């Protein structure tokens, strides 16, 4: 799953439209007479001018002018003068309104320098204070912004709910959107742990809706019925008045299963074997679907035996309402262009990812992408606490692609540079590894010292200590060579890096070399399969290799996604437990696969 890398945000940059509205409402022009001071208004003069007026006044009016001077000093970005004014006001007897404004300004000054916790501690309005409404609005808005900066979304939401009750109708819709966005930051596992107080009925309603959306997404009919019932029972709740778009989209969704499906694969030619395994997995899933419609049809088309025109004619004559495939990138693009020229776009799940995705084509994309797998590895290594990885990959175009994918994902989480080595000739492999870990440099330094001194040194070559994880893109035989080379290159008194590998190393065959301690990634079907599925597959295809199982799993997931994609497009964060991974979609409708991890030699 995608990991959120939180960053504290500056409160001034978080000025929401609602906050701006509150500020503007307090910006009424101050009277020309200096006898009347509205301390909730924005400063129109300089801090020095207000200070001169304060020095010419006394009592409450003097305090009012000091507060306006403090406001102006903060606006002028003069923290030193602001701090002096805060200290001066601290010695004065203040009315509740002055005390409230003083708290707001102290907190804002601290928030401006990202001292958020200290800012929060300044804000302690008393419930019995009789204050102008704008001060209560500013109080809740500032607390909401500070909580947001502290990544405390639920506390921020609590403040926004309080602000909602004090706001004008023109601000309420934007506030409702902000409340909903805050709650959507939470995952299903975290949101169910949140709770409200007995007197927080409005917040509790928002929370309940968010929990429904996060936990019932896998059963869309139940989610739809639950939402409809809740909204009918709570017609005056802000969520019923300003219903979030994510909810209205679900309420408007008509759940329709495809009736006539076409499976487009190159069943002859270069990729015939791969296509046949995908077909087998698709049909296997279809035959195991207890909810399959009795009138459902499947048309399998060999894309190498038909022209584009004849494929289109078959789709039309068979009244196809969903297409799975093609498998070849070029065929995907050609079919999309042909359908667009005809103005007939059939919902499609392509079984590859084109280099350039046409977002107007309305298609989704599923593939066993090596780039997706190594990107997952980069994320996994970081979440496991590793900070200085090395990636070893073949010295070819494939190796360069996966290294680029690993680097791109790693940069999302860390500024540390990834060490990279591409291996080619296996005879050079040990030399490459020694070079990576600095062993050759260490040996050369020792030789130079011995030459200079004219005598032998009792010393041991030292390996570099910064690499804490090695991700190896290699098949099983390559991994059996690489692992001992790494072990030899590491000094006995140093902590060895953790070794990881991709799914190519998991052949499913007998391992004649010790690969224990190497953690590898692969699809769930090969790491933790459902017992019933594993038993059926073994009975039907007892001789299938792991590579063939992955293709069958791709076909199985393609069938499942036919039904699930409409929900996935609408329900934010919607995932399904597939055979090739935990499946979700991105903004281009490319299916993302969260793969599984296991250790070689552990069953």
UniProtKB/Swiss-Prot annotation:
Its biological purpose: Regulator of peptidoglycan synthesis that is essential for the function of penicillin-binding protein 1A (PBP1a).
Name the source organism: Vibrio cholerae serotype O1 (strain ATCC 39315 / El Tor Inaba N16961)
Which GO MF terms are attached to this record?
Answer: enzyme regulator activity
Provide the topology term for how it sits in the membrane: Lipid-anchor
Lipid-bearing positions (S-diacylglycerol cysteine): 27
**Residue ranges of the TM segments:** none
InterPro entries from the entry?
LpoA, Peripla_BP_I, TPR-like_helical_dom_sf
Q: Which Gene3D superfamilies match?
A: 1.25.40.650, 3.40.50.2300, Tetratricopeptide repeat domain
This chain's protein is named: Penicillin-binding protein activator LpoA
Q: Give GO cellular component annotations, separated by semicolons.
A: periplasmic side of cell outer membrane
Signal peptide residues are 1-26
């Amino acid at each position: 799953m995608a990991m959120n890398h939180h960053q504290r945000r500056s409160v001034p940059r978080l000025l929401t439209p609602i906050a701006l509205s509150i500020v503007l409402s307090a910006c009424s022009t101050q009277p020309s007479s200096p006898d009347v001071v509205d301390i909730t208004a924005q400063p129109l003069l300089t801090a020095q001018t207000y200070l001169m007026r304060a020095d010419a006044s006394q009592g409450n009016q003097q305090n009012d002018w000091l507060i306006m001077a403090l406001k102006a000093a903060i606006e002028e970005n003069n923290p030193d003068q602001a701090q002096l004014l805060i200290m001066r006001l601290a010695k004065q007897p203040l009315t509740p309104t002055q005390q409230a404004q003083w708290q707001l300004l102290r907190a804002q000054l601290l928030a401006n320098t990202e001292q958020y916790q200290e800012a929060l501690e300044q804000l302690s309005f008393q419930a019995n204070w009789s204050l102008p409404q704008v001060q209560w609005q500013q109080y809740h808005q500032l607390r909401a912004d500070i909580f947001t900066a502290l990544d405390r979304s639920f506390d921020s939401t609590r403040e926004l709910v309080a602000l909602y009750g004090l706001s004008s109708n023109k601000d309420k819709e934007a506030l409702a959107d902000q409340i909903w966005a805050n709650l959507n930051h939470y995952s299903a596992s975290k949101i169910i742990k949140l709770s409200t107080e007995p007197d927080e009925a409005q917040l509790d309603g928002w929370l309940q809706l968010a929990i429904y959306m996060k936990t019932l997404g896998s059963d869309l009919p139940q989610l739809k019925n639950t939402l409809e019932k809740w909204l009918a029972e709570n017609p005056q709740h802000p969520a019923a008045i300003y219903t979030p778009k994510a909810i209205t989209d679900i309420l408007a969704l008509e759940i329709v299963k495809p009736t006539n499906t076409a499976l487009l694969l190159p069943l002859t030619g270069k990729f015939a074997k791969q296509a046949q395994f995908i077909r087998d997995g698709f049909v296997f899933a279809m035959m195991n679907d207890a909810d399959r419609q009795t009138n459902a049809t499947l048309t399998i088309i060999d894309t190498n035996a038909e022209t584009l025109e004849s494929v289109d004619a078959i789709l039309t004559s068979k009244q196809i309402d969903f297409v799975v495939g093609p498998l070849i990138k070029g065929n995907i693009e050609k079919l999309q262009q042909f359908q667009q020229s005809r103005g007939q776009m059939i919902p499609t799940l392509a079984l590859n990812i084109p280099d350039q995705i046409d977002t107007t084509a309305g298609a989704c994309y599923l593939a066993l992408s090596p780039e997706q797998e190594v990107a997952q590895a980069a994320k996994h290594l970081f979440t496991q606490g590793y900070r200085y990885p090395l990636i070893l990959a073949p010295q070819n175009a494939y190796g360069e692609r996966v290294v680029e994918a690993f680097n791109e994902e790693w940069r999302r989480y860390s500024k540390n540079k990834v060490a990279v080595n591409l291996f080619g000739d296996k005879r050079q492999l040990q030399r490459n590894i020694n070079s990576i870990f600095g062993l050759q440099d260490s040996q050369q330094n020792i030789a130079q010292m011995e030459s200079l001194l004219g005598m032998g040194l009792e010393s041991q070559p030292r390996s570099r200590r910064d690499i804490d994880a090695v991700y190896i893109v290699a098949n099983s035989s390559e991994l059996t060579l690489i692992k001992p080379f790494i072990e030899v290159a590491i000094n006995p008194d140093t902590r060895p890096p953790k070794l990881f590998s991709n799914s190519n190393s998991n052949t499913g065959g007998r391992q004649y070399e010790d690969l224990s301690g190497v953690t590898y990634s692969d699809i769930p079907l090969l790491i933790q399969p459902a017992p019933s599925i594993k038993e059926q597959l073994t009975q039907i295809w007892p001789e299938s290799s792991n590579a063939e199982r992955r293709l069958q799993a791709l076909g199985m997931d393609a069938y499942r996604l036919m039904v699930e994609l409409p929900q996935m497009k609408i329900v934010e964060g919607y995932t399904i437990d597939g055979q090739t991974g935990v499946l979700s979609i991105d903004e281009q409708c490319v299916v993302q696969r969260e793969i599984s991890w296991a250790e070689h030699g552990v069953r």
